[in-house]
Regions:
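A short beta-strand-loop-beta hairpin characteristic of the jelly-roll/cupin
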Residues: 5-17
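Structural motif
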Residues: 4, 48-50, 132, 163
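Polybasic "coupling" helices that flank or enter modular domains
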Residues: 46, 67-136
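Phosphate-/nucleic-acid-contacting segments
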Residues: 109-172
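Glycine- and acidic-residue-biased ligand/ion/polar-headgroup-sensing regions
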Residues: 1-8, 24-25
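A short beta-loop-beta micro-motif enriched in histidine and acidic residues
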Residues: 15-17, 37-39, 121
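Cyclic-nucleotide recognition modules
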Residues: 20-78, 82
Length: 172
């Protein structure tokens, strides 16, 4: 309902990968409908958050009685599966720098606000550190810093701690 939640996973050695940063209205834990009781991911509120919880039995009942709701859940799972597939392909086929650029483009398309109706310009107002972006793209913080600096130097983005202004979306 409110706030942001970071979904992550840690290796036995303590290395963290951020799977998602969720915004108000986004859902997590939906795979519990498949019978998976124990989750390995960690959900942490990164700012004050209001979270609604639905019992799995109630969710099953809603899905059985409401075909539109059932379809919405199916679409949600399909959308998340597609994002995971895209991320996997990115890890396999793209360089670290390309992963950072692709991530910025994805953020702009999903969370960016259009500027004066120009489809090339998007303002992303998310508080993400270089370390957060590194953990979301499976790169190092240094790679994120150098990639963002290169994108800024080439006029593709403007970046500060609170926002990313994408000036040329098609160049990402």
């Amino acid at each position: 309902k409110e706030g942001k939640v970071k979904i992550s996973k840690q290796s036995p050695e303590g290395k963290e990968i951020i799977l998602a940063i969720l915004h108000p209205g986004e859902v997590f834990g939906e795979l519990s409908i498949t019978g998976q009781e124990k989750r390995e991911e960690i959900a942490i509120a990164t700012e004050d958050a209001v979270i609604c919880m639905v019992d799995v039995k109630d969710l099953h009942m809603l899905m059985e009685k409401n075909p539109k709701f059932n379809m919405s859940i199916t679409k949600l799972i399909g959308f998340k599966l597609k994002k995971i597939q895209n991320r996997f392909e990115s890890l396999v086929f793209k360089s670290s720098e390309e992963r950072v650029s692709s991530f910025i483009k994805e953020l702009a398309e999903e969370h960016g606000k259009a500027i004066l109706g120009n489809p090339e310009e998007k303002l992303i107002q998310l508080k993400l550190t270089h370390d957060d972006i590194a953990k979301l793209t499976s790169t190092s913080r240094q790679t994120v810093t150098s990639t963002l600096n290169a994108l800024e130097k080439s006029g593709v983005i403007l970046y500060d701690r609170r926002s990313i202004f994408v000036k040329q979306l098609s160049k990402l």
